[in-house]
Amino acid sequence: MDLIPTANQPIGPFYHFALTPGWATGDNSAGVMAGPGTLGERIRLTVRVLDRDGSPVTNGMIELWQADAAGKYDHPADTQNRTPDPAFRGFGRLATDDQGLCVFETVKPGQVPGLRRQLQAPHINVSVYAPGLLRRVVTRIYFEGDPANEPDEIMRLVPEDRRASMMARPGVESGQWGFELHLTGPCETVFFDV
């Protein structure tokens, strides 16, 4: 008896459209995290999700969580004695397009205290859901050239030659940042086991 192997295929289909408001109509307002009165340095962050071969990952979903410009999360676990910026929404969720892209309008986050109360470098927490993943993957986006990166306690846990995979790079225009997120392969982004 000859057995035919099962075809290699990713899990799916991935129903991101049910979780990303406005996806079907092209409304990307779920990626606008900074309102008109939001304090801090406004940034436009373009995230591009790529597979092993450097091809765009379509039908993925990206979630961002971050502190406001003063380094305060709008979350009960943040016990700092400060009020979060009421005009800032520290969460955004978008689907990737046919180029693997999604664009968030936010602010550069402030430094937040770490486990030993040492200030962490400005960063954005990222969750990725995509075809072929059985569960989300989680990373951080840091900002290239920020002097707070070097002493950051989480960054120091990552081998030096892998840290670049977590860096957003400045764009041509002021306030624009780009981040390439590689799910697998030789340029794979560092992911955390959370």
Per-region residue spans from a language model:
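Beta-strand-dominated extracellular/periplasmic modules and repeats
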Residues: M1-V194
